[in-house]
């Protein structure tokens, strides 16, 4: 399904991406959903909560993408035991999570790192 969406020219248009106030980011960015790396391999940059489609074509494209990802037979669903964590490279994995269930006996540390990093 992603192959078909990757070939759709709408996926290579610039999309506007915003953030809710809770993220403390007061600017928007523009980039396509699909592009290619230096070797021509497909890449995806997508977060389902923040797109601001600029027209019906973009809105329909995002809906098809969301439906395709949700219906995918390739997704992995796992439960993390209390005290476990996952570190994921956002440039390699698409990921999501359900809301945290509050546990008064645990503390949660959220670390956001933004910026450019050394690339070998």
Regions flagged by a language model, labelled:
Residues 1-82, 87-120:
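Active-site environment of non-heme Fe oxygenases that use a 2-His-1-carboxylate facial triad
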């Amino acid at each position: 399904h992603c192959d078909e969406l990757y070939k759709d020219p709408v996926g290579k248009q610039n999309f506007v991406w915003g953030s809710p106030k809770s993220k403390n980011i007061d600017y928007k960015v523009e980039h396509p959903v699909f592009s290619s790396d230096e070797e021509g391999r497909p890449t995806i940059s997508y977060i389902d909560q923040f797109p601001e489609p600029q027209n019906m074509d973009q809105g329909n494209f995002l809906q098809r993408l969301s439906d395709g990802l949700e219906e995918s037979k390739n997704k992995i669903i796992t439960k993390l035991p209390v005290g476990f964590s996952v570190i994921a490279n956002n440039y390699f994995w698409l990921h999501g999570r359900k809301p945290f269930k509050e546990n008064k006996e645990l503390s949660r540390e959220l670390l956001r790192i933004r910026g450019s990093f050394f690339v070998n």
